Regions:
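A glycine-/small-residue-rich N-terminal strand-loop-strand element
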Residues: 1-13
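Mid-domain Rossmann-like dinucleotide-binding core that forms the NAD(H)/NADP(H) cofactor-binding site
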Residues: 6, 47-121
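NAD(P)H dinucleotide-binding glycine-rich loop of Rossmann-like/cofactor-binding domains
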Residues: 10-75
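Glycine-rich phosphate-binding loop and adjacent beta-alpha segment
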Residues: 11-13, 145-212, 245
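Short, glycine/polar-rich helix-capping loops at beta-to-alpha or helix-loop-helix junctions
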Residues: 22, 100-107, 171-176
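Short amphipathic alpha-helix with an adjacent loop that forms part of the alpha/beta core around
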Residues: 122-133
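C-terminal hydrophobic helical "lid"/dimerization subdomain
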Residues: 196-245
């Protein structure tokens, strides 16, 4: 790196598996620091690293998303869900997004969702009303507690990527692989703890090519961390919460 280079850090477990997120300075492995070739300002850039890496990796590295795909984004109002909708819409996909709150429907449509379903835990029949043969791809952000239902939304040869655990259930002891995965369909997953330069470069190229702007809900100063957490835990944020250091 050179002086004045714009760089980002992507640490995966920072703030969860280990401390270090709320500091003015942090010592990081060089493999977790990346050059950011972008015109985004620092507030926008702060919303990119892990969220875009997770969404992009899930869509293009795992689901092999293409322009003619139909995709269900289950957990559409999560930070990763919002970015996934933006990325999928940028290449021309048809998108079904889910939310638990009716007041989020218009927001999801504004960022690119073609259809929005209120998620009560069982949505497969509602998805089949829109796509009788099922969708070609599913991004599962809610988790293992609804994966059986999400599998039922897949078309033949469809792929489901398990990325999120918004439902707080990491593992399922009742998951019957043979019975749950439809014949000719595929289950994969994405884990964000292994960032690499190739994908990060692709992400910034994609952002520039399609003029994608990160959706920012609110910006706080570092002294307002508690307020940022309260907003996050209220589930009322529409987009990323950014903290200025």
């Amino acid at each position: 790196f050179k002086k004045d280079d714009k760089v980002i850090a992507l640490m995966g477990g920072m703030g969860r598996s280990f401390d270090g997120g709320y500091q003015e300075y942090a010592l990081l492995p060089t493999k977790n620091v990346f050059y950011a070739k972008t015109n985004l300002d620092w507030i926008e850039l702060g919303a990119v690293p892990e969220t875009f890496f997770t969404a992009y990796g899930s869509l293009f590295e795992c689901l092999n998303l293409e322009a003619n795909d139909s995709i269900l984004v289950r957990g559409g109002t999560s930070a990763t869900g919002i970015v996934a909708i933006q990325l999928a819409k940028s290449i021309g996909c048809k998108i079904i997004a889910t939310t638990r709150k009716e007041e989020k429907i218009e927001f999801l449509k504004e960022i690119g969702a073609d259809f929005v379903i209120i998620d009560n835990g069982e949505i497969s029949k509602k998805v089949k009303e829109i796509y009788p043969k099922g969708v070609s791809k599913v991004l599962e952000l809610v988790g293992t507690n609804v994966i059986d239902d999400s599998m039922k939304t897949l078309a033949h040869k469809g792929i489901l990527c398990l990325t999120g655990i918004l439902g707080s259930k990491v593992a399922s002891s009742n998951f019957d692989i043979i019975k749950t995965i439809p014949n000719g369909c595929y289950l994969t997953s994405f884990f964000s703890n292994y960032p690499n330069k190739e994908i990060m470069d692709k992400i910034f190229n994609h952002i520039e090519k399609y003029n994608i702007k990160p959706v920012i809900s609110k910006v706080f100063n570092i002294g307002e961390i508690s307020k940022a957490h309260l907003l996050m835990e209220s589930n009322n944020a529409n987009g990323k919460i950014v903290v200025l250091v």
